[in-house]
Amino acid sequence: MLTQSIRRQFLEYFKKHQHQIVSSSSVLPHDDPTLLFNNAGMNQFKDVFLGKSYRDYNRAATSQKCIRVGGKHNDLENVGHTSRHLTFFEMLGNFSFGDYFKTQAIRFAWEVSTQVFGFEPERIWPTVFREDDETFELWTQYVPAERITRFGEKDNFWAMGDTGPCGPCSELLYDRGSDYGNATKPSEDSSGERFLEFWNLVFMQFNRQTSGVQNPLPKPSIDTGAGLERVINLKMGVNSVFETDILRSIIAQIELLSGIAYHPQDQQSAAFRVIADHLRCLSFAIADGVQPSNVDRGYVLRKVLRRAVRYGRTLKLEKPFLAEVLPQLVSTMGSDYPELVKGQDRIAEILTIEEEAFIRTLKRGGNILNQVIEKSRASHQIISGDDAFKLKDTYGLPIEEILLIAKDSGLKVDEPRYQQLEEEAKQRSRHVHKTVHQIAGENIFADFVKVRGETKFAGFTQNSLKSSVVGLFVNGEFVEEMQSGQEGLVFLSETPFYAEMGGQVGDTGTLENSNSKFSVEDCVVPYKGLIAHKGKLNTGSLKNGEMITASIDKKRRQKIANNHTATHLLHWALHQILGEHIKQAGSVVDPQRLRFDFSHHKALSLEESRQIEDLVNQKIRENLPVKCYEIKYEEAQKKEDIKQFFGEKYGSTVRVIDIDYSKELCGGTHTSALGNIGLFRILKESGIAAGIRRIEAVTGAEAELLQRQDEDLLRTLAQQLKVPIHQVLEKLEKLQEENKQFIAELKEIKKKELNVLINGFIKKIEQLGNTSVLILETALSVEELRLCVDLISDQIPSAVIILGAAFPDKCQILVKISDDLVKQGINANEIIKILMPIVEGSGGGKQHTAQGGGKKPAMLGEAFKQIRIYLKEKMNVK
């Protein structure tokens, strides 16, 4: 394929010119919480440009996977409707870290453009920053001055932020000819279609101060980026990036799947382009460990997937289809990006699960939306913000889907009102947790640190030490003395107590001297660098400046350390059993148990749980030492085998927990050898959010106790069932089968008894127009009501059946509508929604069946009276 060839030739060219060829980084940014996804080739070198880290080379070239779907660079809504916008693309780039500058960068760009890309020299138009005479002069060595265009800061000046590295840039544009517009130079081409940008050279030569002053950098650098898809677009001479080899092959697969031919100018053509692009975006993101969810980048990914599904429906693709197109993507890009091949099955599974869930949402909310549309047409041609919010909040229908369907129906949505309700809901859901930070606000602790200094933590090597009291905090203020019986915070100059952080709970213990004893119930960080001992003074009084002995509860600390190290083992084991996509999403470590949240798209099977448990226990038995050491953060960044976590802020020096095969940056306390953990048992595995699973586990004595309880339960069952232990399961299965038979026989007996009643019920059917209607209050149980409704509908195939039963403090109602009457507009769910307010209850269902329960059984008769009136109006019966 041409794309593969150009990518390879680009990298080979720069390799010949002493550039280090660096593999594309993940689309998931490393240690950069400012980015949702990597969106440029320079992202992985950001710290190098900022001088925060260093590489063994000063020249580099890459082909970087990029995703642009949020923030400043958000191309999502344009994708499918223009010839060049993509959410996923590859960026070719060459970089200089204080080595070469403008002269060589321009020469490299010219040679690659004309020799590697094979572009006609006379069609290349450089642009420069209006004040950058140096770059203008350099370009005159390659093109006539009249083909060099000057632009202002908006187009030709680049900055990393309000402050920091910045500099002019020079773009390379390619003149596609008069077929793409009448403009004769770039300044006349407002659409950007004729003079298409394909490469941008950034000259980082200044450091912008907060005052706005730009000082020259001691070592200017180069950052360039060329969109591979645009290069291929120009190389092939086609109208759009979607007609290039890789994307067009995906579109061809969509044609086969949908049975609809792709014609670029047709109204339906946008759907082909959206699906082709979004499949690449989704597949690469999932391969790199991102999963669709309701938060952060997972939310953005879910939004992309649902947009693809919505456009798929315009091509009559009503069932999950993305996984069926995936093999085409893997076949064209898998050789260059093996993560696609390795993760293909998992990508397909996640895509299908997400599509199925969204299709269910569309079906559930779609019927209600149709009713809202009819109501809106009858009023002011506007779907109210309240209705839109209810569709989203109650039925899960995305606002994007509501807007799209409304537009297709010739309606508008009251978006300001919708946004108001959305914001109000967010405000209601924000819970305020009272912590030490809110006792008096952070300012008081910030001032305290400035005066008294940070707390020195010595707990990695000492369980007990002598220290001086530097602060006492009682009832929201600092005091000079704490009295017996008072609760508060004690601050020390040095402490062995670990403060709650990184999921690990704080230590407990005592602070004491000859005059007093303070029980430490928790240890927290109220402000960066400050450790607070939270608890109660049991005896005596405690004053600022006094010396005390600070002692942690050693047994408790050891249990916590064992559980924390076991958490690292669990994390490693999950990678081995489930795959490299596993990412930590949270953890809690306390003396009793550990809890670990991680990204995964489905529940663990019994076999997977057993494999994970067995692997962790195998490693515990091997009893390897657990090494803990500190290194410079920039050194840790260079080591690919050390795990660190996105969004976590690390200092210049970091602590590594090294178990040979598992290395993580971690500031917590750990056991000295794996054998100390003893035993590992999984208590529970569950889902806590879309795409996030949770494992709860115990170790040591707690695990032994759990094992003993399981054994005791098994022995008790064997005794009760009067069989040996190895036959318990067989006996239970036999009893279950017998129970099923008994229940079936009881149902048959009940049916025979009810048939007598049913004959009487059928005689009470009334005719409303041509429709058979049975509305009846009975003295049946809920189970009997269900049986009766089914038996009556078997005998009367076309009817509205509404049966109710009153009990002393509640009532129950069941509704069933035959298929022919549903088609005439009679809806069981609508009926139950009318009945429930009258009996002060709640309920719901579908078009054919619904049920509900109420708190006012005495109102059952009135409810049935009202529903008769409703049905008469619905059927136009007087």
From Swiss-Prot:
This protein's species is Protochlamydia amoebophila (strain UWE25)
Subcellular localization: Cytoplasm
Primary location group: cytoplasm
Q: What is this protein called?
A: Alanine--tRNA ligase
Q: What's the gene?
A: alaS
Its EC top class is ligase
Its required cofactor(s), as named, are: Zn(2+)
The record's InterPro entries line, in alphabetical order, gives: aa-tRNA-synth_II/BPL/LPL, Ala-tRNA-lgiase_IIc, Ala-tRNA-ligase_IIc_anticod-bd, Ala-tRNA-synth_IIc_core, Ala-tRNA-synth_IIc_N, Ala-tRNA_ligase, Ala_tRNA_ligase_euk/bac, DHHA1_dom
Cofactor info, note text:
Binds 1 zinc ion per subunit.
Residues that bind Zn(2+)? H564, H568, C666, H670
Pfam families in UniProt: DHHA1, tRNA-synt_2c, tRNA_SAD
> What catalytic reaction does the record list?
tRNA(Ala) + L-alanine + ATP = L-alanyl-tRNA(Ala) + AMP + diphosphate
> Sorted alphabetically, which PANTHER family does this protein's record hold?
ALANINE--TRNA LIGASE, CYTOPLASMIC, ALANYL-TRNA SYNTHETASE
Q: Does the keyword Hydrolase apply?
A: no
Q: Which CDD domains match?
A: AlaRS_core (cd00673)
What the entry says about domains is: Consists of three domains; the N-terminal catalytic domain, the editing domain and the C-terminal C-Ala domain. The editing domain removes incorrectly charged amino acids, while the C-Ala domain, along with tRNA(Ala), serves as a bridge to cooperatively bring together the editing and aminoacylation centers thus stimulating deacylation of misacylated tRNAs.
* Keywords noted in UniProt: Aminoacyl-tRNA synthetase, ATP-binding, Cytoplasm, Ligase, Metal-binding, Nucleotide-binding, Protein biosynthesis, RNA-binding, tRNA-binding, Zinc
Tell me the domain of life: Bacteria
Gene Ontology terms describing biological process: alanyl-tRNA aminoacylation
Which protein family is it in? Belongs to the class-II aminoacyl-tRNA synthetase family.
* Function of the molecule: Catalyzes the attachment of alanine to tRNA(Ala) in a two-step reaction: alanine is first activated by ATP to form Ala-AMP and then transferred to the acceptor end of tRNA(Ala). Also edits incorrectly charged Ser-tRNA(Ala) and Gly-tRNA(Ala) via its editing domain.
Q: Name one GO molecular function term.
A: alanine-tRNA ligase activity
Example GO CC term: the record gives:
cytosol
